[in-house]
Regions:
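Cysteine-centered iron-sulfur cluster-binding motifs in ferredoxin-type domains/subunits
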Residues: 16-35, 62-82
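Ferredoxin-type iron-sulfur electron-transfer modules in oxidoreductases and energy-metabolism complexes
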Residues: 1-12, 36-66, 84-171
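Short, charged low-complexity intrinsically disordered segments located at boundaries
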Residues: 73-80, 117-128, 214-216
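Residue-identity detector for threonine
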Residues: 20, 26-28, 64, 76, ...
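Short N-terminal secondary-structure initiator segments
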Residues: 1-16, 25, 188-199
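C-terminal, charged low-complexity interaction regions
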Residues: 144-234
Length: 234
């Protein structure tokens, strides 16, 4: 076995999610992501189980490990109680740690996701925050969300929110003391270090592609090539 395999074995999710896979394919049959994406959790588990270093490295640099929605349907149906979703989490973790995520289109999307969501959490105390939500970036949310963003204050008031207000209520202003505690949690758990790692490798990739960070952000956020979905042309 190689170095990458050994690093994976240190992850508790591998210990809990990969026990005695018999390659029956039940996980792929039940997987919602496999219905749409070119994604086969059975093959992924088989690659990890074999421990081939080159194949594991290819996985870590691929789009494949980013298709999983982590719903864990696989765990509920596996006759041997394996959890391919847990294996995927371990692969994603190692890919981010080593910087391999920037080698795949879906992996590079870690940058805008981290920038937006963790930025919102640490600055406002919320994953999604009205001031940073742009309907133009999420047109799939439909006309209802378009109307909602155009009439934000009225909509929030009608729903009883306390937007940016003091005291209890939806979207209330989070005290700085609480935000400082969130930052400490990020620091202690390694989340801050992970954010810095993602930022560092993303900047290196942007430089390699000849893009500014804003250009890289927009590209990773908006671009989607063909070949990800089952009905795409090969």
């Amino acid at each position: 076995m190689g170095k990458l395999y050994d690093m994976l074995q240190e992850d508790y999710r591998i210990k809990e999610g990969l026990k005695t896979c018999i390659n029956c394919g039940t996980c792929t049959a039940i997987c919602p992501a496999a219905e749409f994406y070119r994604y086969d959790p059975r093959k992924i588990v088989d690659i990890v189980q074999k421990g081939n270093e080159d194949e594991i490295e290819a996985l870590l640099k691929s789009d494949t490990i980013w298709y999983c929605g982590e719903c864990m349907s696989c765990l509920t149906r596996c006759p041997r109680k394996n959890g391919p979703g847990l294996v995927i989490m371990a692969l994603r973790n190692l890919s981010a740690k080593l910087g391999y995520f920037v080698e795949s289109e879906k992996g590079r999307q870690l940058y805008p996701l981290t920038k937006i969501m963790t930025g919102n959490i640490l600055k406002y105390g919320y994953c999604i925050y009205p001031d940073t939500f742009s309907w133009e970036d999420h047109v799939e949310s439909g006309p209802v969300w378009k109307w909602h963003t155009e009439h934000l204050e009225d909509s929030l008031e009608r729903n009883g929110a306390n937007f940016k207000g003091k005291g209890p209520g939806i979207l209330r202003d989070i005290p700085q003391e609480s935000l400082d505690e969130l930052q400490k949690i990020f620091d202690v758990t390694g989340a801050t270090e992970r954010m810095e790692t993602i930022d560092r490798y993303s900047r290196m990739k942007a430089e390699q592609l000849g893009m500014s960070m804003e250009e890289y952000y927009r590209h990773t956020f908006e671009y989607c090539s063909e070949g990800h979905f089952n009905d795409d042309q090969a």
